[in-house]
Swiss-Prot record:
Pfam family, one: cobW
Cellular compartment(s): Cytoplasm
Binding, GTP: 14-21
GO molecular-function term, one example from the UniProt record: nickel cation binding
Keywords: Chaperone, Cytoplasm, GTP-binding, Nickel insertion, Nucleotide-binding
UniProt protein name: Urease accessory protein UreG 1
InterPro entries found in the cross-reference section: CobW/HypB/UreG_nucleotide-bd (IPR003495), P-loop_NTPase (IPR027417), UreG (IPR004400)
Keyword Transmembrane helix on entry: no
Coiled coil: none
GN (gene name): ureG1
Single Gene Ontology BP annotation: urea catabolic process
């Protein structure tokens, strides 16, 4: 099923603790029986996120590759994406029929974006626990990602966040670009994200 242009590469970014790894796990579980898939994770000094996915059984260990960026995490996905491009090339060597590569950035800030050379689609994850004001702060991840995921909606009552305000701000900042409100630990919203990837990414 692999495209002649190579696998679809989906970049998943967002601040530390927003739920990127939870989303990676949910997507791996949804896609692994239908597509040739692998996952690449970025951490500054460890391969912790890769370990989490492996322990969770999201994919076989050989389909998960941890990248240690050793510095500013957004540099490894934007200004100098060579370490991640090399990781994609390695996975394509291991699995020549790859359909889909999920690339999780290291915890980054609201200004971080993926290089178009690295990712065909970009998803950005923020979380309700970060505060009601997060969507209105803007930044490329919030305003220009192909899909914005507002995660941990279940925590809204605990942190005093008004989801209707967050949604209004999200709509204002993104215009017509799509977004999803989710609670990924419970699996809520993951199907919508998976469907978006299939449709927007042209997966057959």
């Amino acid at each position: 099923m692999a495209s002649v242009n190579g696998p679809l590469r989906v970049g998943i970014g967002g601040p530390v603790g927003s739920g990127k790894t939870a989303l990676m796990e949910q997507l791996c579980r949804r896609f692994r029986d239908s597509y040739e898939i692998c996952a690449i994770t970025n951490d500054i000094y460890t391969k912790e996120d890769a370990r989490i996915l492996t322990v969770a059984g999201a994919l076989p260990e050989e389909r998960i590759l941890g990248v240690e960026t050793g510095g500013c995490p957004h540099t490894a996905i934007r200004e100098d994406a060579s370490i991640n491009l090399a990781a994609v090339a390695e996975m394509r060597r291991r699995f020549p029929k790859l359909d889909l590569v999920l690339i999780e950035s290291g915890g980054d800030n609201l200004a971080a974006t993926f290089s178009p050379e690295l990712a065909d689609l970009t998803l950005y994850v923020i979380d309700v626990a970060g505060g009601e004001k997060i969507p209105r702060k803007g930044g490329p991840g919030i305003t220009r990602s192909d899909l914005l995921i507002v995660n941990k909606t279940d925590l809204a009552p605990l942190v005093g966040a008004d989801l209707s305000v967050m949604e209004a701000d999200t709509q204002r900042m993104r215009g017509t670009r799509p977004y999803v409100f989710a609670s990924l630990r419970e699996g809520h919203g993951a199907d919508t994200v998976a469907r978006f990837i299939v449709e927007a990414g042209g997966l057959g």
